[in-house]
């Protein structure tokens, strides 16, 4: 039996109805959060100018079409210029999701969120990109380097063409022990050398804040110690705000401030009264 056009459309709607209901149910949490904490297009907060990161009641909800999950749950956070912060959490704790929000890689679902004085919840994609380009350096867990380019070219990709004579390049190559490798392709470098290239690329534009997602997770202890020593010295010498995310409790001992996260919530936030030096930490 053939179906006319009207009956065929009706059948299509019936077949699509379960998916529609599922999607509608899955978005309830996001709708509820937005009603509770409505977005304000031109929201300002007098505190924002004093902090590199200012979060008040920030939530991030995600859905896979079936279940809802708060991956960041009512986060209150202030990070002042020049701080050295380590965010500690186990796998799945929400630390990388939080890092995406405070680095302006992602927007919250609700709450008040400022990064470098800008309300990220009010920014469109182009505005978020501009905010990151001007203020944020980010070291990705998987480095994100272009394998067919050499060290110099990978680093220079992070800055506009007209600024690629940046004197900061020579300083970074020197401090990160990359000068003798500058013309080598990424495929010819060790894992530790590739990590240092990723760090140089994140810092070449002299960002206001440097974020690192498990910056020593893929290298051995000796390389980790060198990289962490670089972060400590760079924070001290340049005054750049540094925020590192890790599951390694040893790294916490270096930080001036420690934030612990569990199930998308900040469960501890304290100052380290006496950060240890690299050599004082028992790395075994």
Curated annotation (Swiss-Prot):
ABC transporter domain mapped to chain residues: 53-284
Binding site for ATP: 89-96
Record SMART domains: AAA (SM00382)
Gene3D superfamilies, A to Z: P-loop containing nucleotide triphosphate hydrolases
Keywords: ATP-binding, Nucleotide-binding, Transport
Taxonomy, superkingdom: Bacteria
MF terms in GO: ATP binding; ATP hydrolysis activity
Cysteine disulfide links: none
Family in the record: Belongs to the ABC transporter superfamily.
Classification via PANTHER family: ABC TRANSPORTER ATP-BINDING PROTEIN MG467-RELATED, LIPOPROTEIN-RELEASING SYSTEM ATP-BINDING PROTEIN LOLD
Name of this chain's protein: Putative ABC transporter ATP-binding protein MG468.1 homolog
Native source species: Mycoplasma pneumoniae (strain ATCC 29342 / M129 / Subtype 1)
